[in-house]
Amino acid sequence: AVVRERGAELAEHLRRRVEGRNGPDAILFGSGEFSGRTLADVAAAQDRPFEDVLIELGPDGASAAYFVMDERVVWALLADPHTVVSSDGSPSMLHPRGYGSFARVTRRYVVEEGALSIEEAVRKMAGQTARNYRMDDVDVVDVPRGQVREGWAADLVAFDPAEVRDAADFENPHRLAE
């Protein structure tokens, strides 16, 4: 009903939103019939405007990855001592962040760029996150975690940061990090 009554307005809204987020080349479908293809590719193959493709898909048509990150913002966030590194990836999601987020931070921002020390990266990815969720509070949890301390739970992995690699990509999003 909305498409019939307000289709032109919806198309214009979608056009502005997509163009304001780096365009249809910056949207990669992660599920549905167009999984692994960009919105621009699908629209070109169908010889129609990308907004028409989106309208036909509807609000529940597919998940997608949006390439809109601004590296300046990422660097500013990494420099903030209160920022944690986390991921909303999951095994059911066709996105490499489900398997490669933390390896990528280690590889890129610790080893290659030197934006973080390995200690700070681990704190942002584990210890600070535990504190934010009060997993270090003995009044909240039976066995605290978030630090390597006697009596606390800890899942420890010894690794060489220079050997860590994120192997997942959009073609193979479930590839484990090395």
PLM regions and their residue ranges:
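Active-site neighborhoods of metal-dependent hydrolases
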Residues: 1-114
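C-terminal cap of metal-dependent C-N hydrolases
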Residues: 76-82, 87-88, 101, 156-178
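Short, well-structured alpha-helical segments that form the helix of a local strand-helix-strand
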Residues: 51-57, 118-127, 148
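Loop/turn positions that initiate beta-strands
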Residues: 151-154
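Composition- and surface-driven signal marking solvent-exposed, interaction-prone regions
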Residues: 55-56, 69-70, 144-148, 169-173
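Short alpha-helix capping/helix-loop boundary micro-motifs
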Residues: 135-146
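Gly/His-enriched, cation/cofactor- and phosphate-binding structural elements
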Residues: 104-131
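Short, solvent-exposed loop/turn segments at secondary-structure junctions
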Residues: 131, 139, 165-168
